[in-house]
Structures are given as structure tokens and as C-alpha cells.
Amino acid sequence: MDPVTLAVLKGRLEQIADEMDATLFRSAFNPIIAEAHDASHGLYDPVSGETLVQGKSGLPVFVGAMAFAVKAVIDKTAESGGVQPGETWIFNDPYEGGTHLSDFKLVRPFYFEGTLLSLIHI
């Protein structure tokens, strides 16, 4: 891939994550999320669980924990054939990417034309 295409794709992925942040913060009823921005978002590799891109407006403390949460979903679903279209995993287990009980994780697959492209973490 040439450097220009790579830069364009990188910028687009960053914009997607930033728009995820903005949408949640704008629509949140809870002032802790709406005003303090106590959340983070990211796109993750569906095989390894590694971070592809993350939003810039959320709290940095979640960024490290989010990859562990995504990896936990990948590991839990491996026996049943992996994450399937339409599934959403929501949990607050502090041993699987958690920080404390009031922080929950939401992981959902992103498919395009039947191909799993990434896992979305909110």
C-alpha cells in the first residue's frame, strides 16, 4: 500500500472513532458521560484483538483496558465459531478488561458484505 493511501485510510479510521465519541457524548443522558466524557471507543482487529484506532475524546484510562475486553470476547466466542453478525457482548467483569463495576464494556462485530472487518468497543 502506498503512503498516501495509508494516510487516507488512517485518517478515515480515526474520524470514525472520533465520531463514535461525539455521538455518544451528544446523546448521553448521564452527565458523567455527556459532560465529563467518561467513556472511550475504538476499532479492534477481529483476530488478535489489537487496537486499530481509538477515539481521542474519551478517557485514556480505558484505552488499555479495552483491548483486554475485546480479547476476552474473542476467546469466549472461539469455541462456538467466533463472533457472529448481530451479536453484542456487554459486560462489566473487572477481570476481563474492567476497571470498576460501574464501567461496562460493549463489544460488537462490524461486518461488510459478510466479511468481519473489525470489532467495535464502546
Model segments located where?
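Glycine-rich acetyl-CoA-binding "A-motif" of GNAT/NAT acetyltransferases
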Residues: 116
